[in-house]
Swiss-Prot record:
This is F(420)H(2) dehydrogenase subunit K. GO terms for molecular function: Methanosarcina-phenazine hydrogenase activity; oxidoreductase activity, acting on NAD(P)H; reduced coenzyme F420 dehydrogenase activity. It comes from Methanosarcina mazei (strain ATCC BAA-159 / DSM 3647 / Goe1 / Go1 / JCM 11833 / OCM 88) (Methanosarcina frisia). Its main location: membrane. Optimum temperature is 39 degrees Celsius. Its EC number is 1.5.98.3. It is a multi-pass membrane protein.
Length: 102
C-alpha cells in the first residue's frame, strides 16, 4: 500500500482554506459565515494531522483534537447568538444588524 504524499494533503488543505475564505468574504448570512469559518479551521486541522503523521509524533493530532473541541464550542455559541438575533429581528443579515456595536 502506497502512502499519500504530504503535498496532496497540503494542496487539499489550501483548497479548503481558499473556499472558506471566499465564503467568509462573500456571504452575508451569519450561519453561512460560521460554516465557512469552520471549513477554514478544518483545513488547518488537516495540516496539523498531515504534518503529525509524517513526523511520527502525536503532538499535531492532539492539538487538532483540542482545536476541534474549541471549534465546536465556538459554533455552538455562534449559533445561539444567531438564534437569539433571529427571534428578535426575524433575519440574520449581518450587514443590517448592528446589535453588538457600542
Amino acid at each position: 500500500m502506497t502512502a499519500i504524499p504530504l503535498t496532496f494533503y497540503l494542496g487539499l488543505a489550501a483548497l479548503l482554506f481558499s473556499i472558506g475564505l471566499y465564503g467568509v468574504m462573500t456571504h452575508k448570512s451569519g450561519i453561512r459565515l460560521i460554516m465557512c469559518i469552520e471549513l477554514m479551521l478544518n483545513s488547518a486541522n488537516l495540516n496539523l494531522v498531515a504534518f503529525s503523521s509524517y513526523t511520527d509524533t502525536l503532538h499535531g493530532q492532539v492539538f487538532a483534537m483540542f482545536s476541534i473541541a474549541l471549534a465546536a464550542a465556538e459554533a455552538a455559541v455562534g449559533f445561539a447568538i444567531f438564534m437569539a438575533i433571529y427571534r428578535m429581528h426575524d433575519k440574520i443579515n449581518l450587514d443590517e444588524l448592528n446589535i453588538l456595536r457600542w
